Amino acid sequence: MPTVNQLVRQGRTMNKTKTKSPALMSCPQRRGVCTRVYTTTPKKPNSALRKVARVKLTSKVEVTAYIPGVGHNLQEHSIVLVRGGRVKDLPGVRYHIIRGALDASGVENRKQGRSLYGVKRPKAAK
């Protein structure tokens, strides 16, 4: 426990909170170019082939970003919009690609939860 004199001289320091998505540099999203699009396997106990991409952001940082949804049209040199948000069973993946923005198309035939996957409202069937 510090003395009053120590507190007068030094004061108390606040703990700085560390950001979970440093590559975005305090921006909500960043644009980037895909350098590699590939699949990877999740940690135990899950099993799948998760679609991910290495993206070089405009902030000159290269990150691994998850491609959500069923099917995608991304390839090398595709321009994408990246947001924060990790994937729990993929170590090192701390970003998501935004579907329906720039070169990333929306998910085909999606009817529910469309806003997260860049899908317009379907025309009402008569």
From Swiss-Prot:
Q: Which Pfam families match?
A: Ribosom_S12_S23
Keyword Ribosomal protein (UniProt): yes
Bias class Polar residues marks the residues at 1-16
* Single GO term (MF): structural constituent of ribosome
What keywords were assigned to this record? Answer: Methylation, Ribonucleoprotein, Ribosomal protein, RNA-binding, rRNA-binding, tRNA-binding
Q: Which residues carry this modification: 3-methylthioaspartic acid?
A: D89
Region: Disordered, residue numbers: 1-24
Instruction: Offer one example of a GO biological process linked to this entry.
Output: translation
Which SUPFAM superfamilies does this one have?
Nucleic acid-binding proteins (SSF50249)
Cellular component (GO) terms are: small ribosomal subunit
Assembly, in brief, is: Part of the 30S ribosomal subunit. Contacts proteins S8 and S17. May interact with IF1 in the 30S initiation complex.
Instruction: Give the function comment from the record.
Output: With S4 and S5 plays an important role in translational accuracy.
Q: Of which family is this protein a member?
A: Belongs to the universal ribosomal protein uS12 family.
This protein's name = Small ribosomal subunit protein uS12
